[in-house]
Amino acid sequence: MTTGNGDAPVIKNAHSDIDSTNKTLLKSDALYKYVLDTTVLPREPECMRDLRLITDKHQWGFMQSSADEAQLLGMLLKMAGAKRTIEVGVFTGYSLLATALALPEDGKVVAIDPDRESYEIGRPFLEKAGVAHKVDFREGKGLEKLDELLAEEAAAGREAAFDFAFVDADKPNYVKYHEQLLQLVRVGGHIVYDNTLWAGTVALPPDTPLSDLDRRFSVAIRDLNSRLAADPRIDVCQLAIADGITICRRLV
């Protein structure tokens, strides 16, 4: 749950009465623990576990992707046979590490985030896992860096040559990211958006008291969800995993 534009320091104190540290929308803590203990944590690579535990102690650790979400991300990448990928919103790199581990030896992930300091926390784990060579980290705001990437691809004579993209960044810009990524990800490729249920606020009545940040992000996510549902350029599937994940497959 990263912002991608440097909003991280203010988020934790800007939430409404929402438990932003809760990594699941499941109503049963026991059921979520069962999922984690049965099929997720026993298969979590040691390097990912170590990074997750260190990030949990970070003052913004609640922004970290959940272990079951990271497992799903790795599975999607392998099922898609992805080789060239994009990640918008990195934080300490837990989901980035999951991506790098899932990619083939010659795979590459362009990772974009304005917060290099947080990325540096996770970089030693990428190196220890032997996958740092797969990561092309680009410090800066998501929209600007994606525009630069579009220009680079055009200069190299490549059009829509990425296989996969994962977005966990500033929610008000998700709709703009979608248009950029549709130009970067190939037909048949996938774009995955995180936090598409925003702690359940998307289903609350309009007059529900919310903090300014939660209202702004919830409105942005509802707008995204409506647009994705009506977008004829993609297949779309929304899952109630973690804080909501939406998987898009480009059709045209």
Swiss-Prot record:
GO terms for biological process: methylation. Changing N195L: Total loss of activity. Ubiquitous. Highest expression in stems and roots. It is found in: Nucleus. It comes from the Eukaryota. S-adenosyl-L-methionine binds at S65, E87, G89, V90, S95, D113, D170. Gene3D superfamilies: Vaccinia Virus protein VP39 (3.40.50.150). GO terms for cellular component: nucleus. It holds the Pfam family Methyltransf_3. It is an enzyme of class 2 (transferase). Belongs to the class I-like SAM-binding methyltransferase superfamily. Cation-dependent O-methyltransferase family. CCoAMT subfamily. Catalyzes the stepwise methylation of tricetin to its 3'-mono- and 3',5'-dimethyl ethers. No 3',4',5'-trimethylated ester derivatives are produced. Can use caffeoyl-CoA, 5-hydroxyferulic acid, luteolin, tricetin, quercetin, myrcetin and 7,8-dihydroxyflavone as substrates, but not naringenin, apigenin or kaempferol. The 2,3-double bond and the O-dihydroxyl group of the substrate are both required for catalytic activity of the enzyme. This is Tricin synthase 1. It comes from Oryza sativa subsp. japonica (Rice).
